[in-house]
Design a protein with these regions (language model features):
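C-terminal catalytic "cap/lid" subdomain
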Residues: 2-276
């Protein structure tokens, strides 16, 4: 028999409550989480927009990242690009579920990350897999100024079955990671100057106007083409730390540098995070 008189009970405000009742959990969970890496700058590099363009787009950006290392500690995340779209096409033709397509696309983003890490290897930059970023990022960034990883979130077989194409892709993954770590900021590097009123490469491109500043709430109502994942817009509304994201043109030398120095050189998107 177990002597139950010796069992210690831990007083916990959540122990006897349902975690589904917001009114009960808010007094405990409503506080602002700590910032684990408040000095970190997260940079997401587009797969289709940058990496697929080859050396003419990649090498100047690598030089810019190299020059930024003395100023910032960076987590550089890469998207998948056109190869993921081909994988989607083949997978859909074979009838694969969305949860099987997600890790296949993520592997393509990882390949782009390895390419970028190889080019920055002389500066001590290496590629880290998801578990290492989750558990050992701080110690790696104490040894070097930057690391590279895949921007795809590791939903994989847990991907939401709301669409035949994975909805949580590279932009979404970069934001989730930056917000969870309490990073100083997130900059998304694309091949356009920011978010436009209409697709600048579409039939009505001549009428497209650059939105210098907007909000996730406004973009949620936006019906046009976005250079970002739609799921990212939804997640921005519930952000805890990242108050704004800047989308910049990585094909223009110096834009990324200016953005990381706090300059307004693209589209700034305000999230739902409250100022500290």
């Amino acid at each position: 028999m177990v002597d139950t008189a010796q069992i210690k009970h831990v007083a916990s405000p959540l122990a006897r409550q349902t975690l589904l009742d917001g009114e009960l959990t808010h007094p405990v969970a409503g506080g602002r989480p700590i910032r684990m890496l408040p000095w970190l700058q997260v940079v997401k590099i587009g797969g289709r927009s940058i990496m697929d363009r080859g050396r003419d787009a990649i090498l100047p950006l690598v030089d810019e990242l190299r020059n930024l290392l003395p100023e910032h500690r960076l987590l550089i995340l890469t998207g998948a690009g056109i190869r993921a779209r081909h994988v989607y096409s083949v997978g859909l033709d074979l009838g694969l579920p969305v949860g099987s397509l997600a890790p296949l696309a993520a592997s393509e983003a990882g390949q782009n990350g390895h390419i970028l890490a190889f080019l920055l290897a002389p500066e001590g930059v290496s590629y880290l897999e998801h578990p290492t970023i989750a558990n050992q990022l701080a110690i790696h960034l104490s040894a070097t100024r930057a690391v590279v990883g895949s921007a795809f979130p590791p939903y994989h077989h847990h991907e939401f079955p709301t669409s035949r194409i994975p909805t949580h892709r590279a932009d979404t993954g970069a934001f989730l990671l930056a917000d969870a770590l309490g990073a100083a900021g997130l900059t998304i590097v694309e091949d356009v100057d920011g978010v436009y009123s209409t697709d600048p490469n579409g039939s009505g491109g001549k009428q497209a106007q650059l939105l210098r500043e907007t909000s996730a709430a406004d973009l949620a109502k936006f019906k046009g083409t976005l250079p970002l994942d739609r799921a990212l817009v939804e997640i921005m509304l519930t952000a805890r730390h990242i108050e704004r994201v800047q989308v910049v043109n990585g094909l223009v030398p110096g834009r990324l540098t200016a953005a990381l120095r706090g300059e307004h050189v693209g589209t700034i998107i305000r999230t739902g995070a409250r100022p500290a």
